[in-house]
Amino acid sequence: MRCPFCGHDDTQVKDSRPTEDNSAIRRRRSCPECGSRFTTFERVQIRDLVVIKKDGGRSPFDRDKVLKSLRIALRKRPVDDEQIERIVNGIHRRLESMGENEVPSKFIGELVMEVLMDLDKVAYVRYASVYRNFREAKDFEDFLGKMVVPRLD
């Protein structure tokens, strides 16, 4: 595998093990040229998913995009990287199990919202603020008003 730091074509695998949920193989690699170390993941790909965007455009499903958006929403929250990886794997498996090759971006966003609602309410609101394009404080207020949580009195 090519080194992402110097571009050298031949890197060495130093450690290889399954992820916690056995959905991928995690490999630690090092580059003999520049000495950099990095991690790669090997996953099964059942089908090539295509995302249908709001404007009608189509692009290949990018699990890293989902991973990045979850990491942003969950920044400084009590959720570790392994748990985030499991969430992304679960979303990806759910999309593949639908049997459809094309999936609307809105559906992916709703899946992420569903997971975050159960996992962490703060991350849920953070994600919703970007996903639903909040522009002002009133948008947050309206959204939070719909999230009424019963109080214990």
Swiss-Prot record:
Question: Could you confirm whether the keyword Cell membrane appears in this record?
Answer: no
Q: Which gene encodes it?
A: nrdR3
Cofactor remark: Binds 1 zinc ion.
The record, for HAMAP family, names: NrdR
Q: Does the keyword Glycosyltransferase apply?
A: no
GO MF terms listed in the record are: ATP binding; DNA binding; zinc ion binding
**InterPro entries from the xrefs?**
ATP-cone_dom (IPR005144), NrdR-like_N (IPR055173), RNR_NrdR-like (IPR003796)
UniProt superkingdom: Bacteria
The scientific name of the source species is: Paramagnetospirillum magneticum (strain ATCC 700264 / AMB-1)
Q: What does this protein do?
A: Negatively regulates transcription of bacterial ribonucleotide reductase nrd genes and operons by binding to NrdR-boxes.
Region annotated Disordered, chain positions: 1-26
List the top taxonomic levels of the source. Bacteria, Pseudomonadati, Pseudomonadota, Alphaproteobacteria, Rhodospirillales
Q: Where is the composition biased (Basic and acidic residues)?
A: 7-24
Q: Which cofactor does it need?
A: Zn(2+)
BP-aspect Gene Ontology terms: negative regulation of DNA-templated transcription
Q: Which stretches make up the ATP-cone domain?
A: 49-139
Please state which protein family the record places this protein in: Belongs to the NrdR family.
* Membrane-spanning ranges: none
* Leader peptide range in chain numbering: none
Protein name in the entry: Transcriptional repressor NrdR 3
Q: Which PANTHER family match?
A: TRANSCRIPTIONAL REPRESSOR NRDR
Q: Which UniProt keywords apply?
A: ATP-binding, DNA-binding, Metal-binding, Nucleotide-binding, Repressor, Transcription, Transcription regulation, Zinc, Zinc-finger
> Which residues form the unnamed zinc fingers?
3-34
Q: PROSITE patterns, from UniProt?
A: ATP_CONE
